[in-house]
Design a protein with these regions (language model features):
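An extracytoplasmic/periplasmic, membrane-proximal ligand-sensing/linker region
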Residues: 183, 291-337
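Short, low-complexity disordered leader/linker segments with a strong preference
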Residues: 1-29
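A bilobed periplasmic-binding-protein/Venus flytrap-type ligand-binding module shared by bacterial periplasmic
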Residues: 131-138, 252-265, 284-287
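A beta-strand-loop signature enriched in Asp, Gly, Thr, and Trp
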Residues: 224-258
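A ligand-binding cleft/hinge motif common to bilobed small-molecule-binding domains
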Residues: 88-92, 212, 217-237
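Periplasmic-binding protein-like
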Residues: 157-165, 275-299
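Extracytoplasmic ligand-binding site segments that recognize negatively charged/polar headgroups
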Residues: 35-42, 61, 77-216, 248-250
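Early extracytoplasmic/lumenal segment of secretory-pathway proteins
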Residues: 22-92, 337
Length: 337
């Protein structure tokens, strides 16, 4: 039986041993916060875990909730990586100091400069194009040209749009501010609102369904929504048109990821991020959601490639975040709800 003196000596040692085991990284796991749906991301995590033996523990939630959670957790966060959609969200997380810069040759080679943070705090993993859709029964393709042209009187009562409350149209307007200046961009948005055939819709699918039903003739959507509808209805009476060709190019955005500032398992997070930007994962990622791979060495899914090639906007996608506050204020002034 231990006497009092021995207990006093042993207790600090036991306490130190206990504390040293708390909050320490697990070499066989990586923790990911993601706003991507389970069916779009879990197959990738499973494949990587099978190859490496490293388990991926992930939490799925809305991007805003995940960013707030990272903020609240601070240095005690268990998260090693944040994966989310839209460069605006990634920019915001970086602006809050939630990421750390990553200097990795493989990542820099895999992800083009305009699809990643200038300070390498986050990297694009897939590319989503936001372009025009139209009714081939009521619109001649020759009538179509640019996003800006949809503000012209010829489209009065013919345009459908998604609500401005979703980040996708905020990012589009942010890039317009960067290219055109605030005054001209606002004129365009006011023209859009004046040309609406109906109230704005909650999502891109509803925009295309309205076009198919004859409620309007033209709209602006992310192409993967078009691909999903087309997969379920090959006879969908809606077509894609690549906007701003020979001009600024089609507006593109990303889904992407960054390693968190206080990542407990940084090495595992870097290995996962590097793998996600590589050819195997890029092919799977793009096919799962009918998006474009960020890595230019990887071909698009055949269903996506069938839509044809297009010239994309070369602006760095970080503009979507840097100009987002201005874009939201502009849209509000213009009556775009």
């Amino acid at each position: 039986m231990l006497n009092g003196k021995r207990v006093l000596l042993v207790l600090p040692l036991l306490l130190a041993a206990f504390l040293s085991g708390c909050g320490q990284p697990d070499r066989d796991e990586v923790v990911v916060y993601t706003s991507r749906a389970d069916h779009l991301i879990k197959p990738l995590f499973d494949a990587w875990s099978e190859q490496t033996g490293v388990r991926v523990r992930f939490t799925t939630d809305q991007e805003g909730a995940l960013i707030s959670r990272l903020q609240a957790e601070g240095a005690n966060s268990p998260a090693d990586m944040l994966i989310t959609v839209d460069a605006g969200n990634l920019w915001y997380a970086a602006d809050l100091g939630l990421f750390q810069p990553v200097e990795d040759e493989a990542l820099l080679a895999a992800v083009p400069a305009n699809l990643r943070d200038p300070a390498n705090q986050w990297f694009g993993l897939t590319v989503r194009a936001r372009t025009l859709v139209y009714s081939p029964e009521r619109v001649d393709r020759d009538e179509l040209s640019t996003y800006e042209a949809l503000a012209e009187p010829a489209w009065a009562g013919r345009l459908c749009l998604r609500t401005s409350r979703k980040v996708y149209n905020q990012s589009l307007v942010a890039t317009m501010i960067e290219r055109l200046g605030e005054q001209q961009a606002e004129q365009v948005v006011r023209g859009w609102i004046g040309n609406l055939a109906t109230d704005v819709f909650a999502n891109d699918n509803s925009v295309m369904q309205a076009i198919a039903a004859g409620q309007c003739d033209v709209g602006i959507v992310n192409t993967y929504y078009y691909g999903r509808l087309l997969r379920n209805n090959p006879d969908l009476p809606v077509k894609l048109f690549w906007a701003n060709q020979g001009d600024s190019g089609v507006h593109v955005n990303i889904s992407g990821a960054g390693i968190t500032r206080h990542a407990p398992n940084r090495d595992n997070a870097l290995a996962l991020l590097r793998w996600l930007a590589g050819e195997e994962a890029q092919s799977k990622l793009a096919a799962l959601n009918l998006e474009y791979p960020a890595n230019p060495a990887v071909d698009s899914d055949p269903a996506v490639a069938a839509w044809g090639e297009f010239e994309a906007d070369s602006l760095n996608v970080e503009v979507a975040g840097r100009r987002q506050v201005e874009a939201v204020k502009l849209m509000d002034r213009a009556g775009y709800r």
